[in-house]
Amino acid sequence: MSLIYHTHVYFLPQQAGFAAALHATLAAQLPAGCWLGQLIHREVGPHTRPMFEIDFAASLLPAVETLLQQHRGPLPVLLHPQQADELAAHTSAARWLGEALPLKLDTLGG
């Protein structure tokens, strides 16, 4: 099985319109094989802002990252691999595009 990546695109309530426009752009431009989640207008799990998620095979990472860099504007993005150690996935194995946000790491175990 190939490595799967999760990408979380965060937004503040006042950025919801921009986030929805970005979501629509990504829906039209993401490569085949990507899963694009709906906008979640509240904090969920370890995430400290509203967000939406994109899941994809590691082979698509360059294409997805390029699209996000081109279109994300001021929105922070967390990219991380799916792995058994959720804490490591969201910290040492993760990287940020834009501002690095705090996460509720205690919800991830270790």
What is the predicted function of each stretch?
Residues 1-110:
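Long, contiguous binding/interaction regions
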